[in-house]
Every structure is written in C-alpha cells, then in structure tokens.
C-alpha cells in the first residue's frame, strides 16, 4: 500500500511567503531608520585611560560603525595596551576603553623595556610600581632592536616569566623580593633575592650595593619544584639568611654557599 504524500495547500504556502516577505520589508525599513536617523548619529566619544582623540567618529551613525575594525586600528597605535574596547551606548555615545598591559618585569637592553606575563615588550611609564619590578638580564644578545608591542618567542623569556610567576605564587617566598633574573645562559640561569626586612635588620647592608641578598642558581626546567625546594631551605636556614652567598639548585642535592666560608 503506497503512503500518501503530505502536501500543504497552495493557499497556506502563499500566505507564508507573504508573511516572510512582509517581515523582511519591515526589518529592512527598521534598519534604514536606525542607520539614517540623526537620532543615532554619534555626538559624544568618551575615551578612558588614554589621551587619544576619536573626534572623527562624531556624526557617524552608531550602527554603521565597525567596532572590531576600530579596535584593531587603535590597538596598532598603542603597544602598551593589551586591548582597546569600543562600546556603543545608545542612542549616540561611544566609549573607548584602553586596557593597559600589566608589567611583571623590566628587561635590560640599551634601555629598559617593560614586559607583561605574555612576553610582550612595551615602554615603561616610570611609576613607583615599575621601580620595584625584577629586572631580566641576558636578553640583549638574543633579541636585537626589540620593538614595543611585539611578543618574542625565546626560551630565555619563557624561563624568566616562569620564575616570576612561580616566585609570586610560592607563599614561603612571599616576604622575599625578587630583584633580578639572569638568563644569559639557560644552564646557568639564576636570580637574585633580597632578604625580608626582619632579616636585614640584623646586619648592615653591603656598602657598595645598598641592599642585602643572595644569588640562586636555578638553571632551566622544573622551576616550580626548585622554588619549592628553595622555600624549604630558607625556612631551615632562617637564622643564617644574612650569611648566604648563593644557593645552587641545579643538581640533585642543593648546595648552600655561605659568606666567608672557603
């Protein structure tokens, strides 16, 4: 027995087509009104965290603006920004947010560059916060003529950023200050740590340096584990902190070298 095919009556099909056509015309009319009405012409542009001017947006229809293109164009001119966000505020206002990169260290070249956790270089602004950041040494022979806003993929940068991240997240090391990181040679990579205030109070700062601390030779690989070992060693050597010259974590058994000990 053959199955009967279900067919819509022609009248219903005709009505559906008319409804869809009317709906399309209505949408087109609404879009035309939105994109041509003076009511939606941009009258105010609010720029935050930047002195850039976007006066050229005024008078343009707020719905005609391609915010992705505007954002990409603005980002090209702001290497110290991780993102430039454009927001429509109906009926006639545009807000432009410049979201700045957060520096985690300074990198030493012929001058110092700030670097964020993603490894992007940008020009420092000279704030007090930046003055307390660790300085990365040893990149000047690996990267020639660094450009702001560019991310350089180098194992030396990855190692330095990993050290900074794990040092911050280690609760045992929280009272210490990470002063510098040297990645000139990955196998011999190291960092210099300043003692916490309570330890420094027991001794006089080194005259030629003005601060007291010690070197940590960490090498490459297993950064998190090595810094955990470092934290444990410092807890054990709490009374000898000011007498530590360097700690070598590159080998199976850590080595602690004290000052004035041959």
Regions found by a protein language model. Name each.
Residues 1-46, 50-78, 82-262:
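Charged, solvent-exposed interaction patches on well-folded alpha/beta domains
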